[in-house]
């Protein structure tokens, strides 16, 4: 509590490094990072504090605690649970300094954003604003929005596309094979443009 991402990030980084060290068959230069909801936030946050991951995927993650506060299904009550009664006006360290958006310039890991357009838990703007920041910074990033889906991707065909998108992104950045990604998104604008798509 009252650490937002710091404490959890230290645990994940330490565990990942230890696992790689203890398993010689693991290529430590090709580790992927993925998370959804709070895990999506953690995925974004981790990329601001470490470079151990070769690619990352955030599904429905919070990028800015200050903008998320008061929004969505949870709204201000989120701080009652995860922030231990801290608020934007009482704890800048939690709400600003540990929000990925305010540290976007520190991210160099290729980062994919996935989000349902009808998410009532974490508004889709949380992914859009972080994606926009990384595009402005010239980072490797992409965003795929799943039309008509909420916090969870439940429609069968769209879930298949969502899962294939995950596998294709990791194949591109962890295996050096962008064939699958191109097959799914060959019409996606190049990296100098928006690089986002709705499925």
Model-derived segments and their meaning:
Residues 1-199:
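Active-site-proximal cap/loop segments of hydrolase catalytic domains
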């Amino acid at each position: 509590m009252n650490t937002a991402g710091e404490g959890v990030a230290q645990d994940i980084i330490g565990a990942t490094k230890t696992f790689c060290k203890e398993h010689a068959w693991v290529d430590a230069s090709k580790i992927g990072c993925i998370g959804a909801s709070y895990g999506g936030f953690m995925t974004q946050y981790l990329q601001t504090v470490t470079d151990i991951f070769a690619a990352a995927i955030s599904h429905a993650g919070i990028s800015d605690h200050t903008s998320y506060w008061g929004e969505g299904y949870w709204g201000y009550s989120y701080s009652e649970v995860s922030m231990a009664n801290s608020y934007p006006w009482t704890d800048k360290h939690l709400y600003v300094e540990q929000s990925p958006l305010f540290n976007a310039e520190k991210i160099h890991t290729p980062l994919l954003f996935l989000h349902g357009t009808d998410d009532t838990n974490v508004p889709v703007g949380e992914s859009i604003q972080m994606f926009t920041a990384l595009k402005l910074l010239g980072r490797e990033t992409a965003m795929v929005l799943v039309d008509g889906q909420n916090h969870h991707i439940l429609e069968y065909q769209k879930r298949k596309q969502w899962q294939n998108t995950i596998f294709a992104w990791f194949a591109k950045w962890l295996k050096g094979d962008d064939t699958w990604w191109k097959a799914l998104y060959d019409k996606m604008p190049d990296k100098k443009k928006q690089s986002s798509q709705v499925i």
